[in-house]
């Protein structure tokens, strides 16, 4: 039976649900502060949990963490912790099954504790030791990897460029200019195209697009216009682009920026182009999206709502809304109640 795992960053919990009924089947509390992303290895049943900062978010956080937790989905126990020091702030995780490597984007430590010290580290899944480290030229928050495990494309947030990394030879191949920066990318099933939502949150003066990178030429081959900002792109088993949309407005009383909308737009590949086929409203800022292997459903974590939306991809409607963590903790400056997702 499938299990849907969702992290509450500010709640420091791993929440387990039956994805069909929507019922909560378990909760692991008191995770290391603060959990961010999830990556499931279906060969071993291990779920890897990244811990990026002790508290806070990308632009305002406490001390970096250098840990990745190992959760056994069979026993439902955290069985180990991977220490990656001196590398700082592991965030996004991907597994190269052919080479038994866990890759993690990091925000520092490769070239010192500077904005330029980020990149990607590779962890041997047998020894759980870091065996690869490749500098990207900036803090790397997210990345995509080609299916053959040869290349990675890093999201460097506000830096204004994407880094192209050779994972085999462990070197930075080149950078691709992306004025305004970017957010969480996706990649086509065959690895031919990577999709970066741009600009990064907080960057003003840029129109929102999905920037499409041709990975054979390492150039931006087209731009898909959007009506509002996008924070993530997930490519499902039918090569549809599921784009997490957001809108931020200024509160009239406090004059602070607040999220006011979240939704998912679906783009269908039509020849070399993409046609928008539907949009559904979800919760506030749909930060992470994954999908069922058959493409029938999408799972959307709404970080500021603390909920997870299950979307019927045939009708583009929300089937269920699961409460992951909707209670704001007084000791947290920002409520981040639903972040990383994994379908186990």
Which residues make up each language-model segment?
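Predominantly soluble domains enriched in secretory-pathway, periplasmic, or organellar proteins
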Residues: 1-344
């Amino acid at each position: 039976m499938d299990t849907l795992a969702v992290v509450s960053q500010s709640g420091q919990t791993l929440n387990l649900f039956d994805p069909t009924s929507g019922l909560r089947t378990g909760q692991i509390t008191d995770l290391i502060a603060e959990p961010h992303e999830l990556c499931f290895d279906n060969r071993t049943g291990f779920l890897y949990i990244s811990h990026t900062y002790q508290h806070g978010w990308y632009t305002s956080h406490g001390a970096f963490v250098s840990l990745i937790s190992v959760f056994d989905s069979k026993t439902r126990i955290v069985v180990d912790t991977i220490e990656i020091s001196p590398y700082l702030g592991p965030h996004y995780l991907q597994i190269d099954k052919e080479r038994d490597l866990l890759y993690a984007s990091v925000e520092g430590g490769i070239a010192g504790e500077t904005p330029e010290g980020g990149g990607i580290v590779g962890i041997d899944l047998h020894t759980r030791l870091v065996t690869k480290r490749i500098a990207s030229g900036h803090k790397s928050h997210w990345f995509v990897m080609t299916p053959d495990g040869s290349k990675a494309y890093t999201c460097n947030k506000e830096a204004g460029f994407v880094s192209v990394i050779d994972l085999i030879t462990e070197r930075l191949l080149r950078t691709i200019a992306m004025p305004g920066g970017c957010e969480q990318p996706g990649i086509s099933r065959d690895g031919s195209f990577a999709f970066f939502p741009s600009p990064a949150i907080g960057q003003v003066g840029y129109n929102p697009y999905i920037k499409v990178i041709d990975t054979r030429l390492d150039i931006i081959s087209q731009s898909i216009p959007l009506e509002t900002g996008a924070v993530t792109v997930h490519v499902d088993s039918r090569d549809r682009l599921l784009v997490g949309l957001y809108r931020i407005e200024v509160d009239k009383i406090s004059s602070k920026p607040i999220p006011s909308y979240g939704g998912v737009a679906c783009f269908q590949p039509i020849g070399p182009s993409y046609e928008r086929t539907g949009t559904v409203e979800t919760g506030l800022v749909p930060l992470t999206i994954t999908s069922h292997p058959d493409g029938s459903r999408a799972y959307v974590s709404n970080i500021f709502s603390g909920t997870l939306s299950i979307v019927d991809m045939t009708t583009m409607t929300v089937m269920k809304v699961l409460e992951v963590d909707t209670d704001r903790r007084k000791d947290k400056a920002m409520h981040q109640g639903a972040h990383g997702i994994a379908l186990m």
